[in-house]
């Protein structure tokens, strides 16, 4: 049956109420092509129906027999209904004033940043800035972040964010293992480090043979450790002078990592000035809501000598083709997509959007504003200390920035009860102690409430705050020897945009430089740049989700946990597995967790020797990097001429490693963009040799509702909620990477002993700092699934496959499609082979990518999985009109290449070799090129009405790496 156009439905009378209700309205807005467009594309492909196309694309042996079993979410909800249902869950959360601390603090998000960054699709729909010429705005914002972190830590260079403080500390541990003394495998963690950080470090250390020791900081120098982690200030609030200790650790051949509070560093001596080699921490309190644990941007800063060992993205300054300053991602050869198992880390997605928010918080407040906030926080803490001492309590710590640990003896339970009555959370620091951490939002009235609570428990009257304030010496809580004297945030960007008008215009000027989904499609293969609907995004900023502390009592987080449980069951239904954990806060972390689960399973069976991981040659670089981190040995399996796993080679490798085979990691559909026909056989071969099957969920957008890894032989998968389930990419994060497992692996899912979170009773430990990872963005995926329902989720998958095949069919006469399945069909993406073009014209895949910018498009994925190719993934959200615009651009570029091939255009002086063309170049007095200005800037007529101008010419990558500079540049450089 052919799809019916809605106009024909409207011509029928009478229409019932059921026909007029708009439960499917969201799906019609999420899926780009309407019924008529879909039919036109199907006609182009030679299929009468979408179902017929899907039958031809997906092997019958792996098709789902049943509709997605979504239970109460099987039927779609309208946007209003879904928001109301989620609001009902949010209202079950109780927003208390949380003074728990432990790395998480309430904060004020400046409204100008909330509206113009967090809620602005120009920022949140962008991709990781691998194409620097169309990413200058967010690259500048991330460079500001790096400058901010380097200044505040007193170290030479910072990266552009990591996932959370705990994983940043674990990354620092492995960094120091690579550069540290080879005779030691000990990493020493001071006993006042945040407990969640210690847990993640232990999880990360075990598979790679690092021994973690924990004890008093004073004993660190004698531990013969290659690295030592110190907390500054400590978890109990102490501000300690570690200068002599750092010297002793260095004298013993070790290195020092400091986990430092970013706000405290505005008033405390920075770690880089007293001996730290690496500093890590969380920037959450710079304007990013707690969000039940995330997402937040962690940071890492290092001494210059370690810059090439840093994990994650690093923004650097270079020049463009005209010699003007330009920004780009630097030192990319460190990263997993290039170095695979030899990479510094498996981190791919980081926390770009949150790093941008934190950097803009610093830009908006400036150094004076930040210091004022810090001094106010410290003053409130000092007044609280004075008040409770006046009431007869003793503080465990005499020095502090914002945190007090108080001896409360037998009054402890009563104190917590009085606090709960005032809707206040205090930290439970044992049976006889209470912790209090104040923050930017703490007011005089809040201080009065806190003093009243302690007074009630003491049977006394709370002291007068003004009297306390008048009698308190200036800054008595900070050791004078550790007060900061060095300047920070001296660059003009942190000293100019302090009025809202200036800030608004600065943010607009940056976003205007970038190309995101709000301008055009982003056809990046394996990245799934689909719609991030506004209704999905709205709940992220609700205080009932944003102002919840991750360690709040369970009775205050009922709504959160119900929503999370529901989302886990939705994902169980989509994957065909038995259980899901949402703790991993990136795809790389979910992948890593999955491999640890496999190892734990083998260990439980007395087969801990199984450590070989088979990985196809076509796999994404994250796979071997994760396997290496999980302590596995990577053995590469060849692919055949069609891009499929070579079954003969797989059998040979499985036979050779039968005794020690742990797992195979496969991506499905494959990274070559096809549904391999023999995926069941692959799984059976590995299972026959005692291994487990890890199915990478990067391409889940081609499977939802049609097939499921848990049903065709997979044992474990990670998903990318920032791909398939609509969490935006944010310019390089946030993301969520749930790990889904079969029933035999469920008990090994991540847990967190310090908070009592036990998803699996024999869990692998914590892989993220918070029990539920990046919990505050989970409502996005919940909303998407609730509004789509089972039928429309399947329709979205089918449309993604339709769109990809339409592009492949239309472009095949111009660019060979490198891999396809039976009937010449692809899955949800296709690979265009540009290698013959380079041979015939000298034009490279890079030239084509840059030329697409002149046409107003982000390039497809370049040279992955095959060098010299473009991988195109349109997703289901793009309309036929937008697909046709992209197709027209690619055909026009092919005509420009043909002109070079035929000698009608010079091999060096042509629009592709000089792309992209900036407005300054096109309007300059001199035009030295053989082609016209019009061809350079307006190669197709549609650009006249809507032209995006790249702000810089082609970035010089080699120059940037040779002359590495990763801080803000002087204004004069832009003159």
UniProtKB/Swiss-Prot annotation:
| A Pfam family that the UniProt record links to this protein | GDC-P
- Cofactor(s) named in the record: pyridoxal 5'-phosphate
Top enzyme class: oxidoreductase
Keywords assigned: Oxidoreductase, Pyridoxal phosphate
Residue numbers bearing the N6-(pyridoxal phosphate)lysine modification:
723
Catalytic reaction annotation: N(6)-[(R)-lipoyl]-L-lysyl-[glycine-cleavage complex H protein] + glycine + H(+) = N(6)-[(R)-S(8)-aminomethyldihydrolipoyl]-L-lysyl-[glycine-cleavage complex H protein] + CO2
Q: Could you confirm whether the keyword ATP-binding appears in this record?
A: no
- Which biological process annotations from GO are given for this protein? glycine decarboxylation via glycine cleavage system
Q: Which cellular component terms (GO) are annotated to the entry?
A: cytosol; glycine cleavage complex
Q: Its Enzyme Commission number?
A: 1.4.4.2
One Gene Ontology term of the molecular function aspect = glycine binding
Task: Describe the protein's quaternary organization and the partners it interacts with.
Answer: The glycine cleavage system is composed of four proteins: P, T, L and H.
What task does this protein carry out?
A: The glycine cleavage system catalyzes the degradation of glycine. The P protein binds the alpha-amino group of glycine through its pyridoxal phosphate cofactor; CO(2) is released and the remaining methylamine moiety is then transferred to the lipoamide cofactor of the H protein.
- Report the family membership: Belongs to the GcvP family.
Q: What is this protein called?
A: Glycine dehydrogenase (decarboxylating)
- Designated gene of the protein: gcvP
